[in-house]
């Protein structure tokens, strides 16, 4: 009844399989199992195009599961939430893609700076539908968390360390990583405990020093 969990990068990156299946007519080898429900529109696209073309994110998830579980096939099963119609598809492992996706995750996790934008053009279709559009292309500030703080480092053993010696929880000494701030925020001064920005849109000088939540209240992505 429980999912099967695999982890990489010391535990910073993990994926849970819905199960492992055996006894398929097409192959006796074990398959990772991935179960999804979807609305009628997405389900019809899945039937017509298959998982890779209609839901590439799901397909990538299947590839990561096969990579971490060291299995060569995945059985992807979907249910139409509107009609209860079912769809099943056997997905073949692509070793190169699996390696690439896990390596990409590792690079992002242990990088000192966030990855580059998918596209510099805010009208690019994938950017417009991204949940972080307001941060990458707009004027919103990301949420306050240890992951967005300059003082915190993810360690290779799966732990987190804080340069301020704090427990790894959101605290009153949070300092945003400058590279994740809105594009109109230009750094004008910085030190070990602060970063000062000029908002190019309004001309306002904003000093991020302690208590980011209070300083940027109202500018947050979720605000």
What are these regions (language model features)?
Residues 7-8, 23-25, 80, 199:
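Acidic surface patches and DE-rich sequence motifs
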